[in-house]
């Protein structure tokens, strides 16, 4: 099965599919967000969650960066905790803090009480996708979800955490409860992703933002089976799939194994790489014929244009070497999201520069 739309000229879809793109494709994680004054103006009238659940607002925010930048993909404006909220979890996204859980999930009773995700609860997200598919023309739309481990960390810790102590303690001390929680979150993530695919997204990305806190052994035992189930199921739908985490150099091989689960001919698998690992090194770590995405340090965008140009050129050159070394393709991106203080003019100039190489 092909992607939802026949976007045969898309540089992004070419690169992630192992075909030679007409130019180096580029898009940015958090390209729609606090770096844009038009986003900040709109958010004065809507909370983060309200914006996610209002189809016209989510559509407008998704489109904002495309009016400024000639990026090669749009990514749905949403948040990884949206399906948790839709499933009845008491949470809020607190400015300058992140997701805060009203009643953390820490016992077997808490896990048992979790409700499944009902499709009707996330219809506004799918309605936003329908609006975007109609508006985007030949620009592909990326849908996304949080991976079970990262969602579990928010639920168990009660909010953002540097070291995830309660999460790891449950994982190691109560493995049966842990896997029950992960199974429930895997089902939730699949419901969210498959609904997005049915609504018309052209690719998906799964963010395991906090997986880098784990050892490779723990990742393989407690996380990989659940992430693999997600990708194996999504693979049936034939859309390109990207797996991304921060600080995951030692996990890249296992993460690529997850995204290649249920592999079929023409399987379109991508692994996101942060700035701590070179793309050529990543190419040696991931499974053969996996495309790579990344990996400019977002802080470089604050360092002035000469530094941006120099480091961005290095990333593109490294990506080309990675393809020679066996990567299926390279999509230029940051190694994490656009920082709020980033000048949109620098991003615009960066897109033009990448396309010129």
Curated annotation (Swiss-Prot):
Binding site for substrate: 30-34, 79, 154, 209, 336
Residues at the site labelled Transition state stabilizer: 79
EC number: 4.1.1.37
Pathway: Porphyrin-containing compound metabolism; protoporphyrin-IX biosynthesis; coproporphyrinogen-III from 5-aminolevulinate: step 4/4
UniProt keyword annotations, A-Z: Cytoplasm, Decarboxylase, Lyase, Porphyrin biosynthesis
Enzyme class: lyase
CDD domains, per the entry: URO-D
UniProt keyword Lyase present: yes
Subcellular location: Cytoplasm
InterPro entries assigned to the protein according to its UniProt record, in alphabetical order: UROD/MetE-like_sf, Uroporphyrinogen_deCO2ase_HemE, Uroporphyrinogen_deCOase
Main location, first listed in the record: cytoplasm
Lineage: superkingdom: Bacteria
Similarity section: Belongs to the uroporphyrinogen decarboxylase family.
HAMAP family with a match to the protein in the record: URO_D
Functional summary from the UniProt entry: Catalyzes the decarboxylation of four acetate groups of uroporphyrinogen-III to yield coproporphyrinogen-III.
Name of this chain's protein: Uroporphyrinogen decarboxylase
């Amino acid at each position: 099965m092909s992607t939802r739309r026949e976007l045969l000229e898309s540089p992004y879809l070419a690169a992630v599919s192992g075909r030679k793109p007409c130019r180096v494709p580029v898009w940015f994680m958090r390209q729609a967000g606090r770096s844009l004054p038009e986003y900040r103006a709109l958010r004065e009238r809507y909370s983060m969650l309200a914006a996610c659940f209002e189809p016209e607002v989510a559509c407008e925010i998704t489109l904002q960066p495309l009016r400024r930048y000639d990026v090669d993909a749009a990514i749905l404006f949403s948040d990884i905790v949206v399906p948790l909220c839709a499933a009845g979890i008491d949470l809020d996204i607190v400015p300058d803090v992140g997701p805060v859980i009203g009643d953390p999930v820490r016992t077997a009773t808490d896990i048992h009480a979790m409700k499944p995700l009902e499709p009707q609860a996330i219809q506004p997200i799918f309605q936003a996708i329908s609006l975007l598919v109609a508006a985007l023309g030949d620009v592909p739309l990326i849908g996304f979800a949080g991976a079970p481990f990262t969602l579990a960390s928010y639920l168990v810790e009660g909010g953002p955490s540097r070291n995830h102590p309660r999460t790891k303690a449950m994982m190691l001390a109560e493995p049966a409860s842990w896997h029950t929680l992960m199974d429930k979150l895997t089902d939730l993530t699949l419901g969210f992703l498959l609904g997005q695919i049915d609504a018309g997204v052209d690719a998906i990305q799964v963010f395991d933002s906090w997986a880098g806190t784990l050892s490779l052994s723990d990742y393989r035992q407690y996380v990989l089976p659940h992430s693999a189930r997600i990708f194996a199921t999504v693979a049936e739908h034939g859309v390109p799939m990207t797996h991304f985490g921060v600080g995951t150099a030692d996990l890249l091989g296992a993460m690529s194994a997850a995204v290649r689960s249920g592999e079929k001919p023409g399987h379109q698998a991508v692994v996101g790489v942060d700035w701590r690992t070179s793309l050529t090194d990543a190419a040696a770590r991931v499974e053969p014929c996996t495309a790579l995405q990344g990996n400019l340090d977002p802080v470089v965008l604050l360092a002035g244009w000469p530094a941006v140009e120099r480091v961005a050129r290095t990333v593109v050159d490294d990506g080309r070497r990675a393809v020679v070394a066996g990567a299926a393709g390279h999509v230029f991106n940051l190694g994490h999201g656009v920082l709020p203080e980033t000048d949109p003019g620098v991003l615009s100039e960066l897109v033009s520069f990448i396309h010129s190489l």
